[in-house]
Amino acid sequence: MGSQARYNMFKIFNPEGCVKQLDFIRQTTELGGTAVGLKNRSVGVLIAHNERRSRLADIQKKVFSIDRKSLFTFSGITNDGLQIVDYLIDKSVREEVIKGRAIHFLDVFEDLLRDVFERTILDGRRLYGVSGLYMTEYDGIRLVEFNPKGHVREVKGMGIGCRAQSSRTVLEAYCEEYEKMGVEELVRIGIMALKNAHPEDDALTGENVEIWILEAGKAVYNIDAKVFLN
């Protein structure tokens, strides 16, 4: 009997040097729609590509408003992503109603990460099959990457989903200049990153690309992608 068959029931040990379940989850998130986020101190931009998999399917929403000053997008299993959206909305409302303040951009994931950690090390429960980007205003604009392995980190820019590494290449090339940029310039960098991941003609259209903006002191809003894709 091969080692893979003998050790498949274990979550945190495999003699081949990798945890198969975590590898499967990584592959799942990389099959999802591409999304990029980038920000400076006063402006944040989230751009998501939602490719239509079938002519019969409607294009679904990819960027979700958590509250007036927070956004979340994800790549991977849709039900898992929507579960995290509901979780973030609930945490935001509880913090505002009970404590009268905005929730910390990393602490908001505390309960979720505990659940992710338990799913990772204990057998019998399915792992989260989704990665995400959370943007909010908390002493400036903040961008946080959520990883299905059970950790979050603050970033200046990040790409997730299908061909995400190609989008990150562009984001990394301009990251030192983000602080000098306004809304339009940041959006153009984000579109450039998305095009690097999807260079095919007509891959990006006004119908399958969402652009959302968060400016310090203002509520989140979206803009027409056609303006930047033409």
UniProtKB/Swiss-Prot annotation:
Superkingdom, taxonomy of origin: Eukaryota
- What is the role of the protein in this entry? The proteasome degrades poly-ubiquitinated proteins in the cytoplasm and in the nucleus. It is essential for the regulated turnover of proteins and for the removal of misfolded proteins. The proteasome is a multicatalytic proteinase complex that is characterized by its ability to cleave peptides with Arg, Phe, Tyr, Leu, and Glu adjacent to the leaving group at neutral or slightly basic pH. It has an ATP-dependent proteolytic activity.
Instruction: Tell me what this protein is called.
Output: Probable proteasome subunit alpha type-6
Q: Which SUPFAM superfamilies does this chain map to?
A: N-terminal nucleophile aminohydrolases (Ntn hydrolases)
Q: Which InterPro entries match?
A: Ntn_hydrolases_N, Proteasome_alpha, Proteasome_alpha-type, Proteasome_sua/b
Family of this protein? Belongs to the peptidase T1A family.
Q: Where located?
A: Cytoplasm; Nucleus
Q: Which GO terms describe its biological process?
A: proteolysis involved in protein catabolic process
Give the organism, scientific name: Encephalitozoon cuniculi (strain GB-M1) (Microsporidian parasite)
Question: PANTHER family from the xrefs?
Answer: PROTEASOME SUBUNIT ALPHA/BETA (PTHR11599)
Which residues span the membrane?
none
Please classify the protein's predominant subcellular localization into one broad category: cytoplasm
Oligomeric and partner information: The 26S proteasome consists of a 20S proteasome core and two 19S regulatory subunits. The 20S proteasome core is composed of 28 subunits that are arranged in four stacked rings, resulting in a barrel-shaped structure. The two end rings are each formed by seven alpha subunits, and the two central rings are each formed by seven beta subunits. The catalytic chamber with the active sites is on the inside of the barrel.
Secretion signal: which residues? none
The gene that this protein is the product of is PRE5
